[in-house]
Regions:
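Transmembrane alpha-helix interface/packing and boundary motifs in multi-pass membrane proteins
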Residues: 14-24, 159-173
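Long, contiguous hydrophobic alpha-helical segments, chiefly transmembrane helices and signal peptides
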Residues: 31-33, 166, 170, 217
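Generic N-terminal helix/loop capping motif
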Residues: 16, 20, 24, 32, ...
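A short N-terminal beta->alpha junction/helix N-cap motif
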Residues: 1, 27-31, 63
Length: 283
């Protein structure tokens, strides 16, 4: 029987933290921590005979993710608004640092053919297109009221965000930006944490969409990981590389910002590279 693993709360916390940042994927962090395949299989198996082991694995992950989103939403609102460039450089370092790990576990030198490299290019192109689709969040935080049309919009946004969250390289929060609801959702989270429940209907609409997206997309991803593993990994590598385009905030504007941005970029790269090596050694 699958046992409750307390360490998975920390892994879920790391995934939830990354999903607060537009352009950074919780799926990428799951890969880096060596739990991606089991995470997808558990979500896919939650409505099957594998319910209990799937449920037991997912509970600490979900607890960690909720803790991260509840405790860090205000911090990331501050960092992204006041220190945007250094923050995004740090996550850019994390993303680049995972690429060697992905190449190693896919054994690309001997396994990849022309079609696999074409899938890598396709993944990069898809992320660039998604990034260019971003229409911002111009009305974020202006209101927490809902209409029937907005309920449908938040549900669809949540569904697409959770589907994206499961794919390394595609950020769930970035998909919320594409739909123009990221800022409002972040405001709703921060208000609910303060026990102001005016934003709760928004979170429920998004939450039900997230649940639907998880159920549907996990089964699709699980199928491709099982039956077309190399092609899927090639696409994932493309997504991860392409996500650099999504997180690039522009160049620093002064020497101090250049220094800070480069330092945190290197820190992010080293952290990601080290975790990737540890995960690869333990597989």
């Amino acid at each position: 029987m699958q046992q409750f693993k307390w360490i998975n709360i920390l892994k879920g916390f790391a995934m939830g933290t990354s999903d607060l940042v537009p352009g950074v994927s919780g799926g990428t962090i799951a890969l880096l921590l060596g739990i991606y395949n089991q995470f997808i299989a558990s979500i896919s198996g939650i409505f099957s005979r594998r319910f209990w082991p799937s449920f037991t694995f997912l509970i600490p992950i979900i607890i960690g993710m909720l803790l991260a989103m509840g405790s860090l939403s205000n911090l990331f609102n501050y960092l992204l608004s006041q220190h945007h460039i250094p923050t995004m450089f740090f996550f850019g370092g994390l993303i680049i640092g995972i690429v060697p790990y992905l190449l190693k576990i896919s054994n690309y030198k001997t396994s990849f053919t022309t079609k696999h490299y074409m899938m890598v290019i396709a993944g990069i192109a898809i992320l660039i297109v998604i990034t260019l689709m971003n229409n911002g969040d111009k009305h974020a935080g202006e209101t927490l009221t809902l209409s029937t049309g907005l309920i449908i919009k938040y549900f669809i946004a949540g569904m697409c965000a959770s589907s994206a969250m499961l794919l390394p390289g595609i950020s769930g929060s970035f998909m919320l930006l594409v739909f123009g609801v990221y800022g409002t959702v972040m405001l709703a989270i921060s208000e609910v944490v303060k026990l102001n429940f005016a934003g709760l209907p928004i979170l429920l609409a998004v939450g039900f969409g997230v649940l639907a997206g998880f159920i549907i997309s996990s089964k699709i991803i699980q199928y491709f990981l099982t039956h077309h593993k190399l092609i899927t990994f090639a696409l994932i590598i493309g997504f991860v590389v392409g996500s650099l385009f999504a997180v690039f905030p522009g160049l620093p504007t002064n020497i101090v910002m250049w220094f800070v941005s480069l330092v945190v970029f290197i820190i992010g790269f080293i952290v990601s590279l080290t975790l990737g090596r540890i995960t690869a050694e333990n597989e």
